[in-house]
A protein has these predicted regions:
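Long, charge-dense tracts
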Residues: 1-13, 46
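Long, low-complexity, mixed-charge
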Residues: 21-22
Length: 217
């Protein structure tokens, strides 16, 4: 992201999900003001060790799970969900959801927003865009032939999970992508985030009664 030239002229809002520095410094000092500033200006003070890290998901003072991405906090609040009062199990999804989700930048001030108001399924989010609730949203890109503004779903993993049988069963992103491990009698959460197919014993077979070969196939 820092070195690509394929998308020139981007704003500071592009950095919202690239590390908690954006919240811990920029947002706490000036709210969403950073979002409309030039990308390079916002990125310049951030050092290599201040991007993704422990504080992306954990409060640096208490190490408890936290959600720092304010676009997600605001969008969930419009659904009457206070993420700061969420259960520990819900937080095991929200820490991922704050960035792994559909989003857009508002026309007024460039802030990050999420189209959750009508629901989390694809049809409800599309309705949100259609009904003019999207804060000046005009489209993600223009079709080169028709010159029509088009909608591009970014990466709606949160919505895909939230409307799944896994969510209904209380299984979160962390259960599958960062499963519990044991070492020397100690139980811990793996922080090697990857496909559950790489940890079928720990991630899948605790719930599924099929064989490992069947699950992988």
């Amino acid at each position: 992201l820092l070195h690509t030239k394929r998308l020139p002229g981007q704003k500071g809002s592009c950095l919202q999900c690239k590390g908690s520095y954006v919240y811990d410094v920029y947002f706490k000092e000036g709210g969403w003001a950073y979002a409309s500033k030039p990308f390079d200006e916002v990125a310049a003070p951030i050092t290599d060790d201040e991007w993704f890290g422990c504080s992306t998901c954990h409060d640096p003072d208490t190490m408890q799970l936290r959600v720092y991405q304010q676009g997600f906090v605001e969008a969930m609040a419009r659904r009457c969900v206070d993420v700061n009062a969420a259960s520990h199990n819900d937080m095991r999804a929200y820490v991922c959801a704050q960035c792994h989700t559909e989003y857009y930048f508002t026309a007024e001030d460039g802030r990050v927003n999420h189209p959750y108001d009508n629901g989390l399924d694809a049809e409800s989010e599309y309705k949100f865009y259609q009904t003019g609730q999207a804060g000046g949203f005009k489209g993600d890109w223009m079709h080169p032939d028709s010159k029509t503004m088009m909608l591009k779903a970014q990466h709606p993993e949160f919505e895909t999970w939230a409307t799944s049988v896994h969510a209904d069963a209380g299984v979160t992103c962390v259960d599958c992508h960062m499963p519990y491990m044991r070492d020397g009698g100690k139980k811990y959460t793996s922080h090697w985030m990857s496909s559950p197919l790489k940890y079928t014993k720990e991630a899948c077979l605790k719930c599924h009664d099929e064989s490992e070969e069947t699950l992988v196939a």
